[in-house]
From Swiss-Prot:
Disulfide bonds: none annotated. Its EC number is 4.1.1.37. It comes from the Bacteria. This is Uroporphyrinogen decarboxylase.
Length: 344
């Protein structure tokens, strides 16, 4: 079997040039995705259709030859499986029934895995469809980020509703995060059992938290997920991405036990290099460079490679690729990383 380069890095080794994949690499910037999406019905229908979900997962692999495929799904399938009436509307994003204390008391996780069984079928299909050398990544949302949507009922600019709820109802918040951690760990184990080589935990809203809350809401629940997964699957490889965490990332790595940490584009490369001394890092090109292209893109790629290319690095963006990105810029990115990534 060919070597899966992402897995080599997750084992703490340096690969030259570094492997590359992109968060949200299957998405609206690709014309083939938009075509498939049209035939799926709703966005959640696409997530729960193994044939179409595996097709859109494979599209960027076919087009760009990336080193990893990431399961096409959404972090909000967990609240959907908890019967929170999740929906997605064009231009408005996700919505669901906002949860309160009594709703948290009534949450029933008994049929979550059955509800998510199409996702596991998608993972199984992908493992048989992907080239041998391509790493298959599963994922889930971190409890804090998922909770922000559950509490507000939709996305908000600074997650004020969830932050306020945490201050006013700390016991209920703790209960919600604990349940989400438990369900998420089961979900990741099932993805690994279905064929995922490694998994990523996305904490997209970690950056709105103060230091104390970051410890309680970002670090502890993710550490709980990782410990639970490892108790059952000791060799599991896990990437944890806490967007906006800044200098708290050092604590985050040490306390969660993640094999690699994802870095957003605001993390200074000098600090990223320090973090890399403790283990693999993933990131951290600004997604806007995939829209801008040109010299700005080339300089951005080279800066990341120059700073981080001599250690264990999975090259990625600092957050998801945007719908405005030019697919040609992804081609240029992959070519540049593979030609320059071995130099220096």
């Amino acid at each position: 079997m060919s070597e899966r380069k992402v897995m080599t890095v997750l084992n703490g080794k340096t690969v030259t040039p570094p492997p590359i994949w992109l968060m949200r690499q299957a998405g609206r910037y690709l014309p083939e995705y938009r075509e498939t999406r049209k035939s799926a019905g709703s966005f959640l229908d696409l997530c729960y259709n193994p044939e179409l979900a595996s097709e859109v997962t494979l599209q960027p692999i076919r087009r760009f030859g990336l080193d990893a495929a990431i399961l096409f799904s959404d972090i909000l399938v967990i609240p959907d499986a908890l019967h929170r009436n999740v929906s997605f509307s064009e231009g408005k994003g996700p919505a669901m029934d906002p949860i309160d204390i009594s709703g948290i008391e009534k949450l029933d996780a008994s049929d979550v895995m059955a509800h998510l069984s199409p996702v596991f079928e998608t993972v199984s299909r992908l493992r048989t469809s992907l080239p041998d050398e391509t790493t298959l990544l599963g994922f889930c949302g971190a409890p804090w980020t998922v909770a922000t949507y559950m509490i507000a009922g939709h996305g908000t600019p600074d997650q004020a509703p969830a932050r306020l709820f945490g201050y006013q109802e700390p016991a209920a918040m703790e209960k919600l995060l604990a349940l989400l951690a438990e369900v998420s760990a089961d979900y990741l184990v099932a993805q690994i059992d279905a064929g995922a080589d490694a998994v990523q935990i996305f904490d997209s809203w970690a950056g709105v938290l103060g230091e104390k809350e970051f410890e309680e809401y970002a670090i502890k629940p993710v550490a709980r997920i990782i410990a639970s997964v490892r108790a059952r699957r000791p060799s599991a490889k896990i990437i944890a991405f806490a967007k906006g965490a800044g200098y708290l990332l050092r604590d985050y790595r040490r306390k969660t036990g993640a094999n690699a940490i994802g870095l957003d584009w605001s993390v200074p490369l000098s600090f990223a290099r320090d973090l890399q001394k403790e283990g693999p890092v993933q990131g951290n090109l600004d997604p806007m460079l995939m829209v801008a292209g040109g010299k700005a893109l080339q300089d951005g790629i080279d800066a990341v490679l120059q700073s981080l290319g001599q250690g264990p690095l999975i090259f990625n963006l600092g957050h998801g690729i945007t719908p405005q990105a030019d697919p040609e810029n992804v081609t240029r990115l992959v070519q540049r990383v593979r030609s320059v990534g071995g130099a220096g």
